[in-house]
């Protein structure tokens, strides 16, 4: 964890199982490829030479997500947010400016790398919200409400845990595993 992303509990549990195992050699093909990919990404960011700093894109992304992919959302708003996130990502790679160099600590470069990650993550968040055709948890899809205005779940379709996989072509695929309830039965919350 680096303070920018929060990891689910499954990741530290997985890593704990690796304690005492032999670390990957810095000369391993995977390690060399990761270093090459990171260097290429940094060089691409430094070469843009645009007019807006990373914080400008970060703020704009927050505005897009707040308006289109917030707690209360609609299909129309999500579709608009998806289009805006994709356009902002293109603008980022065409107009970001990163002051300073890449040979020493550069917080502006760190921010630019994080904003690039956030732009990718934002697209998946919006795709996931579009794909999930129900109201559940803390998220309310306006199209999926009872006549009384309460959230309408769809447990037959969405009683699963899901993760998104990005393919080599940049497309996203949702992977799911069904949930089972053995100790506490699944039930609809009612706050009335």
List each model region and its residues:
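Glycine- and aromatic-enriched mobile tails/lids
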Residues: 1-192
């Amino acid at each position: 964890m680096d303070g920018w992303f929060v990891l689910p509990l499954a990741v530290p549990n997985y890593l704990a199982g690796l304690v005492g195992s032999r670390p990957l050699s810095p000369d391993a093909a995977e390690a060399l490829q990761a270093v090459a990919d990171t260097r290429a990404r940094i060089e691409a960011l430094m070469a843009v030479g645009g007019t807006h700093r990373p914080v400008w894109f970060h703020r704009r992304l927050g505005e897009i997500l707040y308006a289109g992919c917030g707690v209360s959302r609609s299909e129309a708003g999500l579709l608009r947010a998806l289009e805006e996130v994709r356009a902002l990502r293109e603008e980022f790679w065409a107009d970001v400016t990163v002051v300073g160099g890449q040979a020493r600590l550069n917080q502006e470069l760190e921010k630019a790398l994080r904003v690039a990650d956030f732009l990718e993550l934002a697209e998946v968040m919006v795709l996931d919200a579009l794909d999930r055709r129900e109201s559940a948890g803390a998220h309310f899809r306006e199209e999926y409400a009872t006549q009384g205005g309460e959230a309408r779940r769809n447990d037959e379709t969405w009683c699963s845990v899901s993760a998104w996989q990005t393919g080599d072509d940049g497309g996203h695929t949702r992977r799911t595993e069904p949930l089972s309830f053995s100790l506490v039965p699944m039930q609809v919350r009612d706050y009335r």
